Structure formats: C-alpha cells, structure tokens
C-alpha cells in the first residue's frame, strides 16, 4: 500500500482525501462511459493506493446497507470517511429539487433521505455530512416562489439539525456546499454569503452544527475569488470542510487537478489556510477525464496531491512580514511580484 500523502507542519488532521466519484467511468452530458465502471467498494483500495487517507461518498454510491462493510474495509486500509452526502440530484424524483421542490411529497422523501444519511454518516465514522445544492433552484423565473423556497430550506435544515442533535449530540456537523449554476440555470445557496445568511436564520440550537464546504471551481464559475470565500468562512468560524480543484474560466464545472489553472491564487489560498491554522482534512473534488485509460484513472488524484504538497511547501516559505510590509507601504503590485517569485523562484 502506498504511503499516504501528508502536508508539512499541517495543524490538526493531516492527510488528504478524495471522493469515490472522482474515479468514475468518464460519462458526460454528451457521451456515455469510456471506461468500465468500478464497483464502489473496489474504489477504496484504489484511493488508498493513490495516497489518500480519506474517502468521501454519496448515499447512492455507498448506501446505508453497504456502510458497515465500507467502514470495515476502510479500517483495514487505514482510511477514514471524511464526509458523506445525500444525493438530491440524481434520481428523477428530485428533478426539481428536494427541499425546495414545489411538491410536498418530494420534500418529504428528501427529508427522509437526509435523516437516513445522518445515520449512515455516523456508521461510516465521518464527522461531516455535506449538502450540495444540486437541483435546489430554478430554470425559469417564477417557477418557484423564492421566499417560500428559502423558508423550506430553513425548515429542512432545522429538522436535520434537531434530529442529529437529539440522536448524536455534536458528533455530526453539516457543511453546505454552494454553487451558482449547473445543473440548474439558477441555484439557491449559490455562494458563501448566501449560505452564511441561511445559517443565521436557523434555530439558535442548531446553528453551531452548520457550516460550509466551499469548492474552488464553484467560486470561480461565479466569477468570485475563492481565497476571499475561504477567508469569509474562516472569519465566521464556518469552514467545516473544503474541496480543492481547478477551473479554467467561467465555464461548466470542470473538476480539473488542483494547482493547474491558477497556481498563484492557489498559493495564496494555502497561505490563508496555514495562517488560520485550518485543522480539518483537505480533500479533492476532481474528475478523471474521459481521455484517461483505466490504468491511469487515479492520475487526477495523484497530480492534485503532488501539486498541493509542492504549493503547500512554497506557501510555508512565504515571508508573512514581507506581506505586511508591502501592505503598509501600499506596494501592492510589488506584493504580486513577490508572490510570483515565491511561486516560480527557487
């Protein structure tokens, strides 16, 4: 088994993670699979061999029934589950969302799935359950009453929070993952600020259980600065999880290897995480491209990990006093040049 990747001087939990969906069969909206699908539990040893200490999964990938076997296998591999997440986007029943659907029967099913996922999260030993906003949104104006949709989100997350608090105390926390669009034209919980406001509207007892799982590509699709998104989460004490990848412009969600498209901003991100003493696991949400052969399917993960380690060690060497000096002197162009030297220099 490969030696797990670690980050030098990382505070708290060390080791990297990736999702079982990261090494899928290569299907996209314009074409079917280019590789044979790999059984989900067979993907855990592959992630371990790629140097991952943590795995992540949706409830349609590792089901509640599979969870005990997955937990046992993970222990054997020396892995842990970093996060578990219910899929509110794949099944046809959730074509117009789960919590925000106009159909009360669909909302009821979504809540049942969410509560079941809380139980499975505990079985897998994960500390975090993620809610991605997937199909919670609209394609046509006035298709939903936006104020009602917001109230349904508050009501839904309150139910989940109270259920978890009653049954598991603070054993499980919840990280909402914002995205502005895709698969919907417009999505609720589109950005970090929107999610922070949503959390502020939850019942006081459950607010401490809710935070965020920001993803690089999701911020960049919206034309936002991912570093600032992370800083905002940190300032609010709500950075519960993180997904790293790369995004080449404001296009479809590409899930490219971390460090590929904007390495200088990625360097700055790691400076921020180091200075904040971020103690959680660092995980990737990347996707093996259609063109990769089955034997190379984990390249997307190992390339991301090596880029992260290289940038992390560069970030450790960034002189924070120099940054402060550039700020005091208002030499911000010079600051950008210094960061470039830190990135590209010896």
Q: For each of these PLM feature ranges, what is it?
A:
Residues 37-40, 83-92:
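Aromatic- and acidic-residue-enriched carbohydrate-binding clefts of CAZyme catalytic domains
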Residues 54-74, 133:
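Glycine-rich, proline-tolerant flexible connector loops at the mouths of alpha/beta enzymes
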Residues 3-8, 76, 80-81, 93-211, ...:
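Active-site acidic/histidine proton-transfer and metal-coordination neighborhood
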Residues 1-48, 141-142, 158-165, 169, ...:
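Histidine-acidic metal/acid-base catalytic patches
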Residues 54-56, 83, 130, 243, ...:
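Conserved beta-strand positions in the central sheet of alpha/beta enzyme cores
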Residues 49-52, 79, 121, 126, ...:
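A structural motif
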Residues 35-63, 124-125:
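Catalytic domains of carbohydrate-active enzymes, especially glycoside hydrolases
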Residues 18-25, 85-88, 131-136, 176-179, ...:
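Short loop/turn segments at strand-loop or loop-helix junctions that form parts
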């Amino acid at each position: 088994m490969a030696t797990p990747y670690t980050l030098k001087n990382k505070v708290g939990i060390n080791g990297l993670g990736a999702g079982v969906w990261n090494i899928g069969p290569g299907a996209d909206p314009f074409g079917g699979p280019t590789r044979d699908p790999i059984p989900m539990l067979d993907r855990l040893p592959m992630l371990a061999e790629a140097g991952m200490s943590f795995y992540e999964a949706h409830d349609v990938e590792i089901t509640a029934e599979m969870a005990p076997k997955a937990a046992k296998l993970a222990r054997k591999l020396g892995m842990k589950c970093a996060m578990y997440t219910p899929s509110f986007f794949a099944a046809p029943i959730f074509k117009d969302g789960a919590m925000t659907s106009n159909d009360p029967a669909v909302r009821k099913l979504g809540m049942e799935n969410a509560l079941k996922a809380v139980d499975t999260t505990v079985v897998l030993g994960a500390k975090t359950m993620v809610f991605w906003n997937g199909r919670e949104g609209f394609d046509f104006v006035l298709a939903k009453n936006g104020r009602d949709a917001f109230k349904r989100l508050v009501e839904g997350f309150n139910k989940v929070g109270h259920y978890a608090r009653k049954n598991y105390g603070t054993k499980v926390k919840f990280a909402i993952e914002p995205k502005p669009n895709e698969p919907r034209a417009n999505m609720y919980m589109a950005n970090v600020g929107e999610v922070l406001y949503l959390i502020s509207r939850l019942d006081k007892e459950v607010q401490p259980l809710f935070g965020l799982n920001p993803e690089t590509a999701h911020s960049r699709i919206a034309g936002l600065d991912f570093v600032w998104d992370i800083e905002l989460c940190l300032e609010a004490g709500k950075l519960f999880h993180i997904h790293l990848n790369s995004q080449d412009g404001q296009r479809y969600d590409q899930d490219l290897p971390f460090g590929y498209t904007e390495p200088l901003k990625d360097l700055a991100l790691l400076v921020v995480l180091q200075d904040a003493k971020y103690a959680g696991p660092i995980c990737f949400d990347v996707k093996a491209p259609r063109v990769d052969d089955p034997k190379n399917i984990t390249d997307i993960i190992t390339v991301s990990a090596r880029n992260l380690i290289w940038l992390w060690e560069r970030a450790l060497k960034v002189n924070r006093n120099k940054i402060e000096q550039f700020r005091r002197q208002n030499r911000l162009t010079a600051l950008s040049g210094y960061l470039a030297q830190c990135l590209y220099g010896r």
